């Protein structure tokens, strides 16, 4: 069996001001997306991508669950409930498996933004997914969300977030 080697890129410092309202963050994202499409691809980075996923997740939750959530810590228990419901829908094949990957990206972006806004840290990418770096510790948000969506109830978001706050 081949040895596995974890490869993590350098930590990217967060450049987005998460103290802004959701409307302001949405406008910022749309403005930057236009600049990128208009010939400034250097503006695209992992943090920008995660913000886009996070904003998409807000829209998904509003449409599917008729629930408003935001980037505050108070949304963490709600996120656990949403992920549990989505997990059940995936496991019972009410949601096609290919949609699970899209949901995982969006939920990961959402949780990453909550972390950056309320705890701090930077963005990381690796050969096992995206994550955050807090005080030198890498936390793989994408994998945590993925395991929870696949039915691993030990991978709840609340305990993960509380552990990150201790770093």
Which residue stretches match the model-derived regions?
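Compositionally biased, intrinsically disordered low-complexity regions enriched in proline and serine
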Residues: 19, 29-30, 54, 124, ...
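Short non-domain terminal segments
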Residues: 2, 69, 121, 138-140, ...
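The feature captures two recurrent sequence modes
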Residues: 1-101
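Generic structural signal for hydrophobic core residues of well-folded globular domains
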Residues: 83-86, 114, 118-119, 148-149, ...
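Generic alpha-helical secondary structure signal
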Residues: 22, 32-33, 57, 114, ...
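Amphipathic, interaction-prone secondary-structure segments
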Residues: 93-137
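Arginine residue identity/basic-tract feature
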Residues: 63, 106, 144-148
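A recognition module on extended beta-rich or small alphabeta surfaces enriched in W/G with H and D/E
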Residues: 26, 129-167
